[in-house]
C-alpha cells in the first residue's frame, strides 16, 4: 500500500517510493536497528521521515511477554494522525505513507509528515515556570487546551503511550492571545487505536502527562483544573470516582521524588 500527497505524488510519479525513501538525506534524529528518523528538505519545505525496517524476534517476544502489541510499522502513526484530524485534534500532517510485506520480521514501511515549525515543546516553553511564573490566564489557557486535546484523543479511541508534555508542540508566534493558540500532539508511532480506550491505558496516558509536568511549578489547583476539563464533571465526583487513578499518580510521583533525592546524594 502506498499513499502519496503533494509534492511527493508529483515528484515520485512513476518511481518506487520505497527506493526514493532510501535516498533521502538530512538530519538524523534516531538510528536504530529497525527504525530511522530524519528531517529533510524537499521542494523548499521541511519534512520528517520515519522509516521502519521490520522488527526483531527478540522485540516481538519481549512485547508479547509484557502483554503489549509490538510496533511493527508506520501504519499506527498514519492512522492515528488521520483519526485525530477527523475529530479536530491538532497533530502532524501526513504527506506520504508506504507499507509492503506480510512477514513482521521483514515488513518495510515509512511515513513522511510536514515539519511543524516554528514550534516549541511545552516542556521547553514551561521549563522556567517554577522560578518565573507565567501569566495566570496563559497558564489556564494551556491547561484547558491540553486537557481538551487528551480528552478528545481518548474519546476517539486513541491512547498515546508516550503522553508527555514534550510531545505537545506550541505553535509560534504565541503572545498569549487565545485566538493565536495552537498545540499539536506528535510522536504517535506507539499509539493504540480502538473503538474505546481501556481504563488502564487511559490512566497510563494521564499519569505520564502528570509526572512529565511535575517540575514546572503547577499547583494542586492547576491539576484539579485539568481534571475538571478532562472529565467534564464536578471535582467532588472526580475525586470519588477516580480514586485509583489518583493513588497511582501519587505513587508514581513519590517514586520519582525518591529517585531524584537518591541521585542528588
Swiss-Prot record:
Phenotypic effect of disruption: Mutation of the gene results in loss of phosphoryl substituents on HepI and prevents WaaQ and WaaY activity.
Keywords, ordered alphabetically: ATP-binding, Cell inner membrane, Cell membrane, Kinase, Lipopolysaccharide biosynthesis, Magnesium, Membrane, Nucleotide-binding, Transferase
Cofactors that this protein relies on: Mg(2+)
Cellular component terms (Gene Ontology): plasma membrane
Name of the top EC class for this enzyme: transferase
Localization per Swiss-Prot or TrEMBL: Cell inner membrane
Disulfide bonds: none
Functional pathway: Bacterial outer membrane biogenesis; LPS core biosynthesis
Active site residues per record: 162
Keyword Magnesium: yes
Membrane topology annotation: Peripheral membrane protein
EC number: 2.7.1.235
GO biological process: lipopolysaccharide core region biosynthetic process
GO molecular function: ATP binding; kinase activity
Catalytic activity: an L-alpha-D-Hep-(1->3)-L-alpha-D-Hep-(1->5)-[alpha-Kdo-(2->4)]-alpha-Kdo-(2->6)-lipid A + ATP = an L-alpha-D-Hep-(1->3)-4-O-phospho-L-alpha-D-Hep-(1->5)-[alpha-Kdo-(2->4)]-alpha-Kdo-(2->6)-lipid A + ADP + H(+); L-alpha-D-Hep-(1->3)-L-alpha-D-Hep-(1->5)-[alpha-Kdo-(2->4)]-alpha-Kdo-(2->6)-lipid A (E. coli) + ATP = L-alpha-D-Hep-(1->3)-4-O-phospho-L-alpha-D-Hep-(1->5)-[alpha-Kdo-(2->4)]-alpha-Kdo-(2->6)-lipid A (E. coli) + ADP + H(+)
pH dependence: Optimum pH is 8.0-9.0.
General function of this protein: Kinase involved in the biosynthesis of the core oligosaccharide region of lipopolysaccharide (LPS). Catalyzes the phosphorylation of heptose I (HepI), the first heptose added to the Kdo2-lipid A module.
Similarity comment text for this entry: Belongs to the protein kinase superfamily. KdkA/RfaP family.
Protein name, as recorded: Lipopolysaccharide core heptose(I) kinase WaaP
Gene transcribed to yield this protein: waaP
Amino acid at each position: 500500500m502506498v499513499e502519496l500527497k503533494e509534492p511527493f505524488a508529483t515528484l515520485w510519479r512513476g518511481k518506487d517510493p520505497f527506493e526514493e525513501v532510501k535516498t533521502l538525506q538530512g538530519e538524523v534524529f534516531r538510528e536504530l536497528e529497525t527504525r530511522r528518523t530524519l528531517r529533510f528538505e524537499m521542494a523548499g519545505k521541511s519534512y520528517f521521515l520515519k522509516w521502519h525496517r521490520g522488527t526483531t524476534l527478540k522485540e516481538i517476544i519481549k512485547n508479547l511477554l509484557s502483554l503489549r502489541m509490538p510496533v511493527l510499522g508506520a501504519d499506527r502513526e498514519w492512522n492515528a494522525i488521520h483519526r485525530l484530524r477527523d475529530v479536530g485534534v491538532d497533530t502532524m500532517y501526513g504527506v506520504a505513507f508506504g507499507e509492503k510485506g506480510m512477514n513482521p520480521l521483514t515488513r518495510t514501511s515509512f511515513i513522511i509528515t510536514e515539519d511543524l515549525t516554528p514550534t516549541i515543546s511545552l516542556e521547553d516553553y514551561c521549563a522556567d515556570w517554577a522560578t518565573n511564573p507565567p501569566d495566570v490566564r496563559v497558564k489556564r489557557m494551556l491547561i484547558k487546551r491540553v486537557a481538551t486535546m487528551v480528552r478528545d484523543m481518548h474519546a476517539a479511541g486513541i491512547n498515546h503511550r508516550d503522553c508527555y508534555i514534550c510531545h505537545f508542540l506550541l505553535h509560534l508566534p504565541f503572545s498569549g492571545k487565545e485566538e493565536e493558540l495552537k498545540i499539536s500532539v506528535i510522536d504517535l508511532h506507539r499509539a493504540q487505536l480502538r473503538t474505546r480506550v481501556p481504563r488502564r491505558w487511559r490512566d497510563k496516558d494521564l499519569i505520564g502527562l502528570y509526572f512529565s509536568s511535575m517540575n514546572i511549578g503547577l499547583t494542586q489547583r492547576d491539576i484539579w483544573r485539568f481534571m475538571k476539563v478532562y472529565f467534564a464533571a464536578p471535582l467532588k465526583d472526580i475525586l470519588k470516582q477516580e480514586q485509583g487513578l489518583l493513588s497511582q499518580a501519587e505513587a508514581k510521583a513519590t517514586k520519582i521524588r525518591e529517585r531524584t533525592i537518591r541521585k542528588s546524594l
